[in-house]
Amino acid sequence: NIGLRSAYVMSAFVAPHMVKQKSGLMVQVSSLGGYTYLFDVGYGVGKAGLDRLSADMATELNSHGVNSVTLYPGGGVTETTNFPGGETPTFTGRAVAALLSDTSEDELTQLNGKVILTMELALKHGFKDASGELPDGPFSSKENADGVRVSLNSSPFQYNGDGTIPNPNETNNLEIAKLFPGA
């Protein structure tokens, strides 16, 4: 219950310092649940809020040399999730490190306000997960990232006059619940 609020408070505190130094990068870690129905209303609203926070901060801080992006990891392996072949928090950390150390100012300006997939950054910058391999699970592979990018490049159902409401049973079922043993 504190994800979006904490992200906003942190951003509000650090933005003036970044504006003063005329540089900075804010990274919000969200998920595809910010774009399409995933798990439940609370999850989607929180993730959509993070996506909007990044986009709006990019708009307001752009003229001050401060960039803001949203990072979408694939399915993860953490203390509460266990997606087969999933990404570890190390992989997400390496994605942020690549943005900070291996991305030019021009590239950051181009990415400002956008959603970036961890797998896209791994393929571009050549980093791997803690295992020394790229994640290859059905929710974290290159093929999954390619499919997510296609979805992100189209309008969500609520903005598309011909769009259909998602079926919640696709993500709210026993098979998906098994991926969250610690929840």
What are these regions (language model features)?
Residues 13, 17-20, 56-66, 103-107:
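Active-site-adjacent segment of SDR/Rossmann-fold oxidoreductases
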Residues 27, 68-71:
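Hydrophobic structural elements of the Rossmann-like NAD(P)H-binding subdomain
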Residues 19, 25-63, 75-77, 83:
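Catalytic loop of short-chain dehydrogenase/reductase
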Residues 70-71, 83-182:
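C-terminal helical subdomain
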